[in-house]
Swiss-Prot record:
Quaternary assembly: Part of the 30S ribosomal subunit. Forms a tight heterodimer with protein bS6.
Function: Binds as a heterodimer with protein bS6 to the central domain of the 16S rRNA, where it helps stabilize the platform of the 30S subunit.
Domain of life: Bacteria
Gene that encodes it: rpsR
Pfam families, A to Z: Ribosomal_S18 (PF01084)
One function term, GO molecular function aspect: structural constituent of ribosome
Protein name stated in the entry: Small ribosomal subunit protein bS18
Region (Disordered): 1-29
Keywords of this entry: Ribonucleoprotein, Ribosomal protein, RNA-binding, rRNA-binding
Family: Belongs to the bacterial ribosomal protein bS18 family.
Gene Ontology process terms (BP): translation
Length: 94
């Protein structure tokens, strides 16, 4: 009875790879702020901040933009300040 319900051992189980076979390797995203040596992210610099906002006006996550955690916090704070000062919209119209 225990033989029927037992799990296969590690040697019997096929190994799965994290990346699909033959798939292209993903290139690591570059932190735009660090690459361009931007030390201060100003809330009045809407051209820079618009790079980190989606079409609908949402703040893009780190995994999409490639920014570091520290720079993502700076960008988020600057975007929120710009929204309060009405330099950036909270949401966009379709």
């Amino acid at each position: 009875m225990s033989e029927q319900n037992s799990r296969p051992q590690n040697s019997e189980r096929p190994q799965r790879s994290r990346r699909p076979q033959g798939g292209p390797r993903r290139r690591r995203k570059v932190d735009y702020i660090a690459a361009n040596h931007i030390e201060f992210i100003d809330y009045k610099n809407t051209e820079l901040l618009e790079r980190f906002i989606s079409e609908r006006g949402k703040i893009l996550p780190r995994r999409v933009t490639g920014t570091s955690a520290k720079n993502q916090r700076k960008v988020t704070t600057a975007i929120k300040r710009a929204r309060i000062m009405a330099l950036l919209p909270f949401v966009t119209e379709d």
